[in-house]
From Swiss-Prot:
Keyword terms: Ribonucleoprotein, Ribosomal protein, RNA-binding, rRNA-binding
NCBIfam families (UniProt xref): L18_bact
GO CC annotation, single: cytosolic large ribosomal subunit
Protein name per its UniProtKB record: Large ribosomal subunit protein uL18
Domain of life from the UniProt record: Bacteria
CDD domains (alphabetical): Ribosomal_L18_L5e
SUPFAM superfamilies in the cross-refs: Translational machinery components
Subunit structure: Part of the 50S ribosomal subunit; part of the 5S rRNA/L5/L18/L25 subcomplex. Contacts the 5S and 23S rRNAs.
Keyword Ion transport: no
InterPro entries reported for this sequence: Ribosomal_uL18_bac-type, Ribosomal_uL18_bac/euk
Record's function text: This is one of the proteins that bind and probably mediate the attachment of the 5S RNA into the large ribosomal subunit, where it forms part of the central protuberance.
Family: Belongs to the universal ribosomal protein uL18 family.
MF terms (GO), sorted A to Z: 5S rRNA binding; structural constituent of ribosome
Length: 117
């Protein structure tokens, strides 16, 4: 019998491999993206201190619409909250997800609103 590989296990494996190579600092934090079936989350993380500097998610009150529209608004929010914390340059961590759809929408929106990566 053929067994299908668990997609989330493969994603976590990719994410761990990438996390071994990238790390965020206070000057250039890591923009981490987590995507669930219903929601999307973004965090600016300083890996040296182990601190989240800013975060945004589709749970925030001002985020409504379809999943892709929510991702765009979360990108806008994380960019504005990053600017408030005096952060412009980030390292994008797609979390092992394919750079497509909601992950791409969030990244493009964050770029358009002032984050550089």
């Amino acid at each position: 019998m053929i067994s299908k590989p668990d997609k989330n296990k493969l994603r976590v494996k990719r994410h761990k491999r990438v996390r071994g190579k990238i790390s965020g600092t206070a000057a250039r934090p890591r923009l981490n993206v987590f995507r669930s079936n219903a929601n999307i989350y973004a965090q600016l993380i300083d890996d040296v201190a182990g601190v989240t500097l800013a975060s945004a998610s589709s749970h925030d009150a001002e985020v409504t619409g379809s999943k892709t529209e929510q991702a765009v608004k979360v990108g806008e929010l994380i960019a504005s909250r990053g600017k408030a914390a005096k952060i412009e340059d980030v390292i994008f961590d797609r979390g092992g997800y394919v750079y497509h759809g909601r992950v791409q929408a969030l990244a493009d929106s964050a770029r358009e609103n002032g984050l550089k990566f």
